Amino acid sequence: LSLAASEDDVESPAVAMLTQARFDLVLDLGDPPLLQQEALPPGYYAPRGDADALDRAIAELPEMRGEFEKPKYFNLDPEICAHGRRGIRGCTRCLDVCPAWAITSAGEHVTVDPNLCQGFGSCASICPTGAITYAFPSTGDLLGYVRTVLVSYRDAGGADPLLVFFDSESAEAIAGELGAAFPENAMPVELEEVGSIGMDAWLA
């Protein structure tokens, strides 16, 4: 629970009651909240004064117990990163597009925090050197699955296949009215994030 101190208070009463420095779950009631990124870390709730969002957070927080496995969505090769050379700053594309603020400058290359990274994939799609690549699933695994789908479609007598890539947030719409409007040759392929598809996949 995040509560800001008033101007006259040296420290918020809520802060004074804290017995540890790290938490798995945070309900930030500040407006604006302490964290401003578009994609907040898992377990961080910021209703921003929205009563419905606050109700959802209060309902979900007690259910978030136990452990979960967070995948590592990326591979990073700092040797080919074009972020900087000899003290001269270069490419900042991944820094500019990451909605989770998981990427930071580390001098002549960037570094990615695997705990903040949520697999949006825009960094891998926009990286000019391939220093950041998407790893969950890998391009090879994705293309292998797509080939299997296409072969099965062809063997069943299908023609002129149309691949429709969509993310998990669109799954409900695809299964409903939106999917019903697709032509017969459309084959939906669900991804963690559409941004994870780069030119290497489009041109394969």
Features from the language model and the residues they span:
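Ferredoxin-type iron-sulfur electron-transfer modules and their immediate structural context
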Residues: L1-V97, W101, R154-G176, V189-E192, ...
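A contiguous, basic/glycine-rich beta-loop/short-helix subdomain that forms a polymer-engagement track
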Residues: Y134-D155
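Short helix-loop-beta junction
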Residues: E177-M187
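A short, acidic, amphipathic alpha-helical segment used as a generic capping/interface helix at domain edges
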Residues: G195-L203
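Glycine-rich, charged/polar anion/phosphate-binding loops
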Residues: P13, S105, T148-V151
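Iron-sulfur cluster-binding cysteine motifs and their immediate structural context
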Residues: F74, R89-D113, Q118, S122-G140
